[in-house]
Design a protein with these regions (language model features):
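C-terminal motif of bacterial Sec signal peptides marking the signal peptidase cleavage site
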Residues: 15-18
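Bacterial N-terminal signal peptides that target proteins for export
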Residues: 1-7
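Alpha-helical segment that forms one wall of the substrate-binding/catalytic cleft
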Residues: 94-145, 149-157, 175-176
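Low-complexity, Gly/Ser/Thr/Pro-rich intrinsically disordered linker/tail segments
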Residues: 191-201
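Second-shell loop/turn segments in exported
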Residues: 28-34, 44-51, 84-92, 107-119, ...
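Catalytic and substrate-binding regions of cell-wall glycan-acting enzymes that process beta-1,4-linked
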Residues: 84-88, 141-193
């Protein structure tokens, strides 16, 4: 391979990897997250305005699902416990939305979007939690049950599938606690974020 081709490939690799947003440095602090990525705050506000899902609820769900990794994938599945055999599901991106429900979201909203784009992923979570409230009567502020329905699907939640998964109920409690922490943190820095936001325009 010629030296020029090697250089071109190296530059292309650097460009592609540079386009990926790295996860926030302090994922446990919502103020730190929004300070690091102020556009995420703006995207979260747009989601809340359109769907009414509280920022701290949507962000707690996203943290649990992907740890804010843009191209997050579920664990690999294995044949005979050793041979890699695809992934355990089609979940992908910030919101870990699976192919069928992502397709439903795009059809219902007209949003082409991408699962590895934060603004599209946060809007998806808002859309899904709104549908859960409408279909199952679960408040958008009820992080615990919203997360169970998000993880199991609304049909699975209706069948109480989570009750046979004590580990999942513990995870849902963890997400609930994280949302409470996020909510308290946001109250401390909301004015600062709004002041910074007003300076953008």
């Amino acid at each position: 391979m010629k030296q020029g081709q090697v250089l071109l490939l190296a530059l292309l690799f650097m460009f592609l990897t540079g386009c990926t947003t790295t996860p926030p440095k302090d994922q446990g602090n919502l103020c730190s997250i929004y300070r690091e990525y102020p556009d995420w705050y703006e995207d979260s506000l747009q989601m809340q305005s359109e769907y009414g899902t509280p920022l701290h609820v949507a962000m707690a769900i996203m943290k649990q699902e992907s740890s804010y990794v843009a191209d997050a994938l579920p664990p690999r599945d294995y044949l005979l416990w050793v041979i890699p055999w695809g992934r355990v599901s089609s979940a992908y991106g910030y919101a870990q939305a699976q192919d069928p429900v992502w397709g439903e979201y795009k059809d219902n909203t007209g949003n082409g979007g991408s699962r590895d784009s934060f603004d599209d992923a946060i809007m998806f979570i808002g859309w899904y939690t709104t549908g859960t409230q409408r279909q199952l009567g679960i408040s958008k502020w009820d992080t615990y049950n919203q997360y169970l329905a998000y993880h199991e699907g609304r049909g699975g939640f209706s069948r109480n599938s989570y009750r046979s998964k004590p580990w999942l109920m513990q995870v849902a409690q963890k997400v609930q606690k994280q949302s409470e922490i996020y909510s308290a943190q946001l109250k401390q820095c909301r004015q600062e974020l709004e002041d910074d936001r007003s300076g953008w325009f």
